[in-house]
């Protein structure tokens, strides 16, 4: 097992703060804690949500839901990916995890288990329709056939109708969002006649914040809960301000070198010193989820000041130019890859921009090895 020198800090008070902001916009939230809570640790995050009185949570897989049931969580759990197998169906039914049914195959797996093991008892399920994502869901254009199918399938009890917005954060695609909302509304109106108590869920983080009139019974916020701005890089960026990054990532300075003018740094000779410089070697690299894409363009924070990465990010190391440091930097000092405190703290959105991705991937990548590698996890 790889033992990393990287330390991941999870700030629980920031998580609580972000949750309270979201609830102030709409009380009925179903926080998304899939993918190990976006890399933050599903157990830790679920415990905070429970302590804050959250009664509905959305996990990715049924296995994630089972993990929480083993931990004693009693909240309503929605498994967004639905059942993949008969074993998934069994776990969902036995442990009261509500599966998302998004195609005939996922429906059949639940029906089969109910008939064989439950005497045909109706299993509570969520029905997903595709209104434009092109990913999971029954076609919203064929909801009449869907309703007929569900009416003739007494082994399931549809309790939730959901879909997923494609681009609620992008104002130039508002027509797409409006179209999705209209499709969802038409389908819901028809399905509600057959299943009068069915609830709805449509919006994610940007949907909740930018489209408050179309939330439905539950909103499913994700990245905003963890402090990411879902509108970063769009004209609506101000709508996502105020959330606090929950994750901080730090690694130690493991060496300090003087590099002579004209000398190269790192693999491939991608950086040459124009003058004599001082370089700090940081004990973190792409093995820790810190992308090689940050080579020669990323920054770290040491003692409240930013320092630029020089040369390529290595497997377990990266190098930064500390020539212009106004404070003494020593071996063992902390370098923040994410966070760092103060106005110069590195935000998830900045890492995403340097990487050419989104904050979601940043958090998932940096936190992905929690539990698999020996990263130090500090709960604050």
UniProtKB/Swiss-Prot annotation:
One of its GO terms (molecular function) is alanine racemase activity. It is an enzyme of class 5 (isomerase). The modification N6-(pyridoxal phosphate)lysine is found at residue 34. Substrate binds at residues 135, 315. Pathway: Amino-acid biosynthesis; D-alanine biosynthesis; D-alanine from L-alanine: step 1/1. SUPFAM superfamilies: Alanine racemase C-terminal domain-like, PLP-binding barrel. Its EC number is 5.1.1.1. Keywords: Isomerase, Pyridoxal phosphate. It catalyses: L-alanine = D-alanine. GO terms for cellular component: cytosol. Catalyzes the interconversion of L-alanine and D-alanine. May also act on other amino acids. Belongs to the alanine racemase family. This is Alanine racemase.
